[in-house]
Amino acid sequence: MSKVSFKITLTSDPRLPYKVLSVPESTPFTAVLKFAAEEFKVPAATSAIITNDGIGINPAQTAGNVFLKHGSELRIIPRDRVGHC
């Protein structure tokens, strides 16, 4: 089974830490979101993953689909920061 890798950056931290995750293509993206949130110690239930262009990603698809549509560089944001100026 093929794997896809994502570089996920925590945008709410000024140091912009990131994690590189490699998962099977068929992994539900909700699992990727949950794991990334746990790695950054932010609540998964109130976090969103977006592209570098700021486009939100629907987690109800496979990791392979997300990789094909949006590429490997993504950002995770705690939802209390969504639309925050």
Swiss-Prot record:
Keywords: Cytoplasm, Isopeptide bond, Nucleus, Ubl conjugation, Ubl conjugation pathway. Interacts with UBA5. Interacts with UFC1. It comes from the Eukaryota. This is Ubiquitin-fold modifier 1. One of its GO terms (biological process) is regulation of intracellular estrogen receptor signaling pathway. Ubiquitin-like modifier which can be covalently attached via an isopeptide bond to lysine residues of substrate proteins as a monomer or a lysine-linked polymer. The so-called ufmylation, requires the UFM1-activating E1 enzyme UBA5, the UFM1-conjugating E2 enzyme UFC1, and the UFM1-ligase E3 enzyme UFL1. Ufmylation is involved in various processes, such as ribosome recycling, response to DNA damage, transcription or reticulophagy (also called ER-phagy) induced in response to endoplasmic reticulum stress. Pfam families: Ufm1. The keyword Nucleus applies. One of its GO terms (cellular component) is cytoplasm. There is a cross-link at G83 (Glycyl lysine isopeptide (Gly-Lys) (interchain with K-? in acceptor proteins)). UFM1 precursor is cleaved by UFSP1, promoting its maturation: processing of the C-terminal Ser-Cys dipeptide is required to expose its C-terminal conserved Gly residue. Residues 84-85 form a propeptide. The keyword Acetylation does not apply. The gene is UFM1. It is found in: Nucleus; Cytoplasm. PANTHER family: UBIQUITIN-FOLD MODIFIER 1 (PTHR15825:SF5). Its main location: nucleus. There is a cross-link at K69 (Glycyl lysine isopeptide (Lys-Gly) (interchain with G-Cter in UFM1)).
